[in-house]
Swiss-Prot record:
Residue spans crossing the bilayer: none
InterPro entries per UniProt: DNA_mismatch_repair_CS, DNA_mismatch_repair_MutL, DNA_mismatch_S5_2-like, HATPase_C_sf, MutL/Mlh/PMS, MutL/Mlh/Pms-like, MutL_C, MutL_C_dimsub
UniProt biased composition (Basic and acidic residues): 378-389, 430-444
Region (Disordered): 353-444
Chain intervals with Polar residues compositional bias: 353-371
Keyword list, A-Z: DNA damage, DNA repair
One Pfam family, short name: DNA_mis_repair
One term under GO cellular component: mismatch repair complex
Annotated function: This protein is involved in the repair of mismatches in DNA. It is required for dam-dependent methyl-directed DNA mismatch repair. May act as a 'molecular matchmaker', a protein that promotes the formation of a stable complex between two or more DNA-binding proteins in an ATP-dependent manner without itself being part of a final effector complex.
Claim: DNA damage is one of the keywords in the record: yes
Name listed for the protein in its UniProt record: DNA mismatch repair protein MutL
Length: 637
């Protein structure tokens, strides 16, 4: 077979397969062109998932007849005036988008510059360019793409349904809209929901408003601001609380110099920053913007410009991981406020299921409405009917600014990792404890003061404007985990030598894994060695685990190491998994009775500990209900 030259139309169609692989890619390229033209308003219309029609209209600078004719020629661009591919400040730069689209569709362009008296129009039908003609057109450019991929049926065969393609196009527009909050974006489609993002103010507030418009208003309530700079690279944006996680990574928006990217370096850094806070298979929601000198990043490494390459990848990764970890630690004990709303919703559903009308903030009766008349009862006649809920001691009065110093209970110091060993609960002398605790002022501590323990599992604490419900095991597990990490970093893990070694029987593969990890485990105070086939001898344990079950700990560690080996988890992550397993075994269990002092000590330690709003598995350690919400449940709002 002899070699022959391909005709230009076929060459363009082959090239289009790299740049325009689906309608969403065409939409992205056209919107990027509008942004490069300094448009302040961009309108996108889709029909048939973009296969029937794509129309992008903008009010940018427009094009002259000469520019319009050149715009559909391959590798003709106005965005590389000096030919430097390492100083690119625009979204587009190759001059491939329009000729690629024109080779696989019917492409119509209409444009007018502000200084021109009329507009100009040009059509390209499946690679065949027509003549430029004058026309009427407001300032800006309108581009229509029809019959996309009609002449390449193989490409059409691999496209998804109209709804899926329209959603992909909407996502492409949303990502660009998030990166340019001061501009207006409208999107209309026959196959999926549209949107109209009005311009937002410059600065963090405007950026958060645009992110909230894309991700939903709940993100604004669960967002943490991020701002950092290192050696000329600036990081800004917002990240979601760890308890506000998602089932996939679609809510992760990453930008480099205003360009949406899906870069493995950046997503890996995000995963590393959140690894102590999220359960397996869950992903954070965030929008992060990196800005740097164009010379420090190469954007010409991917046909669709979805990936970039940094000159100093270690610097970028270090900045991202460090800034995100610091932000999450500064959030301290904060957890998502959605937990309270979910609890209220469940209460409302339960009320409805019991034959009562559903309770909602919209249908709550106000305090001024007349309550239904109840049949007379003897206990009502004895004075209960005169009780005024507004005089309830549970309602905050005007407390002193600070509780007495003697009422503050510290967990650190003599009790570095746990509680007092004497069990206490809600019987026996606990009534005295509760009466004494009732005199405390709960309003000046973020998590309030303990009032009761439910089912020996949950702590009820009163705050200034409501109460919090704490999962005692989940909260203590996070506290122990953070203290173990500090001890590991300081190399101060205390050990206890066992008088007689504990022998644990295990499958030989598990014994081999634990022996291979012996040096790592020794750093945490756990000394193990092989004890013949299928057995392991434990000679030393961390002193914090002296009251725990050593065999149970060894079995859990073996299971964790097996899972890590399957997932090829790096050593650093394995160390954290070992610590998390230690913490779980040492934490106070559900079903353990706690005294008021112990409960308050836990609350104070939570307030001082970074990340205590969620346990090691990413679940919230507490939920908060506001007094106003509680009152609405009872029709008093």
């Amino acid at each position: 077979m002899t070699i022959r030259r391909l005709d230009p139309v076929l060459i363009d169609r082959i090239a289009a397969g790299e740049v325009i692989e689906r309608p969403a890619a065409a939409v992205k390229e056209l919107v990027e062109n509008a942004l490069d033209a300094q448009a302040s308003e961009i309108d996108v219309v889709l029909e048939g998932g973009g296969k029937t029609l794509i129309r992008v209209t903008d009010n940018g600078c427009g094009m002259s007849a000469e520019d319009l004719e050149l715009s559909v020629e391959r590798h003709a661009t106005s965005k590389l005036p000096d030919g430097d591919l390492f100083a690119i400040a625009t979204l587009g730069f190759r001059g491939e988008a329009l000729p690629s689209i024109g080779s696989v569709s019917v492409l119509s362009l209409t444009s007018r510059m502000e200084t021109a008296t009329h507009g100009v129009a040009l059509s390209v039908e499946h690679g065949r360019k027509q003549t430029v003609i004058p026309c009427g057109q407001p300032r800006g450019t309108r581009i229509e793409v029809r019959e996309l991929f009609r002449t390449t049926p193989a490409r059409l065969k691999f496209l998804k349904g109209d709804r899926a393609e329209a959603r992909a196009a909407a996502d492409a527009v949303q990502r660009l809209a998030m990166a340019h909050p001061t501009r207006r974006f409208t999107f209309t489609s026959t196959d999926t929901a549209g949107f109209d993002y009005l311009p937002c103010a410059e600065g963090p507030e405007g950026l958060l408003a645009r992110i909230g418009a894309v991700l939903g208003k709940d993100f604004e309530a669960n967002a943490l601001p991020v701002e950092a700079e290192r050696e000329g690279i600036i990081l800004e944006g917002f990240i979601g609380l760890p308890t506000w996680h998602r089932a996939n990574g679609l809510a992760q928006y990453l930008f480099v110099n205003g360009r949406p990217v899906r870069d493995k370096l950046l997503t890996g850094a995000v995963r590393a920053a959140y690894m102590d806070y999220l359960p397996a298979g869950r992903y954070p929601a965030l929008a992060l913007f990196l800005r740097c000198d164009p010379q420090e990043v190469d954007v010409n490494v991917h046909p669709a410009k979805a990936e970039v390459r940094f000159r100093d990848q270690g610097l970028v990764r270090g900045l991202l991981v460090g800034a995100l970890k610091q932000t999450l630690q500064q959030a301290m004990h904060r957890a998502t406020p959605d937990g309270g709303r979910v609890a209220l919703g469940l209460l409302a559903m339960h009320s409805a299921g019991q034959g009562q009308r559903p309770v909602s903030s919209a249908s709550m009766p106000s305090a001024s409405r007349q309550a239904p008349t109840m049949p007379p009862r003897d206990w009502i006649k004895e004075g209960v009917q005169d009780w005024d809920w507004r005089q309830s001691p549970a309602r905050p009065q005007n407390p002193p600014q600070n509780p007495p110093p003697g009422d503050r209970i510290e967990m650190s110091g003599s009790l570095p990792l746990g509680f007092a060993e004497t069990p206490a609960g809600l019987n026996g002398d606990s009534g005295k404890e509760l009466s004494e605790a009732a005199s405390e002022t709960p309003h000046d501590e973020p998590l309030g003061f303990a009032r009761a323990q439910l089912h020996e599992t949950y702590i009820v604490a009163q705050t200034r404007d409501g109460f919090v419900l704490v999962d005692q095991h989940a909260a203590h597990e996070r506290l122990v985990y953070e203290r173990l990490k500090q001890a590991r970093a300081a190399q101060t893990v205390e050990r206890q030598i066992l008088l007689l070694p504990t022998i644990v029987e295990l499958p030989e593969a598990d014994v081999e894994r634990l022996v291979d990890a012996a040096s790592m485990l020794a750093d945490f105070g756990l000394v193990v060695e092989s004890f013949g086939p299928g057995a392991l001898a434990v000679r030393e344990i961390p002193i914090v685990l002296k009251d725990g079950s050593v065999p149970a700990l060894i079995h859990d560690l073996a299971n964790q190491l097996q899972e890590d080996d399957k997932a090829l988890i790096p050593l650093e992550r394995k160390l954290d998994h070992v610590l998390a397993t230690f913490a779980c075994h040492h934490s106070v269990r559900a079903g353990r009775r706690l005294g008021i002092e112990e409960m308050n000590a836990l609350l104070r330690e939570m307030e001082r500990t970074p990340g205590s709003g969620q346990c090691n598995h990413g679940r919230p350690t507490y939920i908060e209900l506001k007094l106003g919400d509680i009152e609405r449940l009872f029709g008093r709002g």
